[in-house]
Amino acid sequence: MFQIAVLCVVFGLWLGVFDLALLAFSAPALRSLAGFPAKARATGIFVVRFLPLTLAAAITLGIFVPAWWVHEPENAEEALTLAQAAAAFVAFAPLGEGLRRAMRMASRTHTRLVDWRRRGQKSGLAASCPFDVVEVYGEGVALCVGGYFKPTIFASIAAMKVLTMRERRAALAHESSHASSLDPLRLLGMEACPDFLRLLSVDAEWRSAFARAVEFAADARASAGDRGTALDLAQALVKVARLGLAAPLKGLSVAPAMSNSVDLKARVDALANGPMDEDRRLPLSSGWALVLVCAAVCVLGTQESETAQRLTEAIVALLR
């Protein structure tokens, strides 16, 4: 128990350091990411937002845990002090709060999806779409994607009726992009990110930037560089918005076709008048970036294990 508590404190300290760094550089980081094409912007925001958690976990597991295992005597038994227990609790608080937020949002989302399925029927539109499409009777939904690992497109019957075939195809392509990118799951992750920034609710600009970015990214993928398809999607968005069918989706991890009127105007303008999004990706995929970070941490851990152990012992002494 003592060893676990101390390593939790180490993790919490690193998480706090990286969270402070991200908080300090949030504005320039978001400005820099805004310069990326729409298709890469959302992924960039997501990766940077989770960077403090990733680095803190990698350093703790890749450096401090092995150092403790190698250098701590097997017969070393120390009692857990009140200060150490309190510090471990504070360090673990972001993880606990993140889990609580995720479970609450997932529960609310599940309840809403069950209601939509109860009021809906599987659509014949699914034949031209790689994902299941459920057409829903009544209000409360216009066009959105729900589900984490097996996403489903939910569409209002009234919304589908007002769209032409080309507009319907473009709208479903937009939602299919959300589904293929697992945007509901990523939105859940952004809402429940287990770090101090989310615990203290000082990450609102990152969450709003990501929510906007996934919509622009889905627009860009749906239009696929074709101006005609982009115009069809713009017309579909305007028509569906005018119906006013969608209920507020705040607190739900679903990817709607439109979130608010301001973003809708900007998206329609980008689709109708903006340049087609160039096919430029991030310099490095998130997967390879994670591999490189872990490799660098492992190399550093073999070289600085004694330093890491001294830091751990200093933390233990400070909290006695």
Question: Which ranges hold each PLM region?
Answer:
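Membrane-anchoring/interfacial helices and their immediately flanking loops
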Residues: 1-34, 220
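Cytosolic-facing loops and C-terminal tails of multi-pass membrane proteins
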Residues: 1-3, 16, 88-108, 121-124, ...
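Juxtamembrane "helix exit" motif at the C-terminal ends of alpha-helical transmembrane segments
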Residues: 2, 6, 33, 57-76, ...
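Short helix/loop segments within enzyme catalytic domains
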Residues: 21-22, 26-27, 32, 107-120, ...
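Membrane-interface amphipathic/juxtamembrane segments adjacent to transmembrane helices
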Residues: 29-53, 108-130
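Active-site recognition of the HExxH zinc-binding catalytic motif
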Residues: 44, 155, 159-160, 166-194, ...
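Transmembrane alpha-helices and immediately adjacent membrane-cytoplasm interface residues
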Residues: 49-118
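Catalytic zinc-binding patch centered on the HExxH motif and its immediate surroundings
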Residues: 125-151
